[in-house]
Amino acid sequence: MHMKSVFYLFVFTPFLLFSQSNWQQNADYKMSVDVNVKTFAFKGSQEIVYANNSPDTITKVYYHLYFNAFKPGSQMDVRSLNISDPDRRVKDRISKLTKSEEGNLSVFELKQDGKELVFEQQETVLLARLNKILLPGKKTKLTLLFNGVVPKQIRRSGRNNKDGVALSMTQWFPKLAEYDFEGWHPNPYIAREFHGVWGNYDVKITLDKNYILGGTGYLQNPNEIG
């Protein structure tokens, strides 16, 4: 049986109070994740305290599920196959992924303040309509369970890259979409840049003790993991 190490990370993002004409949403995350280094799979739980600092009433939320782009036939794959100047790291490589090489990110049991939400997932975007509307200046708690698989490396994320990194994981968790003065930004992922909500991240990661975890934030339990 493999021994596992548990890493606690806390990432702080400065949050300022804004006037109604200059506001910004805030999402504070707590996540607990188990990583299987043999199968490249991971599973976890997530809690978000979402603050509506906008002058608008929020009736729904969107999440990004980026790893689902790394499957044959995805919007990212189709775009790369049909544009005249595809990213040379991508080209037709997604279309050639086998089932065991694909990425995945799936959500289940999504709740708002303890009550289950109905949601729909379409490739890299998830939509959930709130049971309780979120008024300006108010907060709500969103909780979910998720699982995923790290894909073969195509761009930045992936398995066993040429530098010897076993698991490169970026944008790997269900990520709440941004809401700003233009409204929601639930853009499907097609290998463009990311747009997200400011907030704090409190993350617990459990994996094989023989692996070294690198990341941003502040390690909370250095004495426990050596």
Task: Mark where each language-model region is.
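N-terminal, polar/Ser/Thr-rich
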Residues: 17-43
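Short aromatic-acidic-glycine turn motif
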Residues: 67-77, 211-214
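Extended, low-hydrophobicity, Ser/Thr/Pro/Gly-biased non-transmembrane segments
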Residues: 86-104, 108-112, 145-226
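Short Pro-Gly-centered flexible turn/kink motifs
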Residues: 135-145
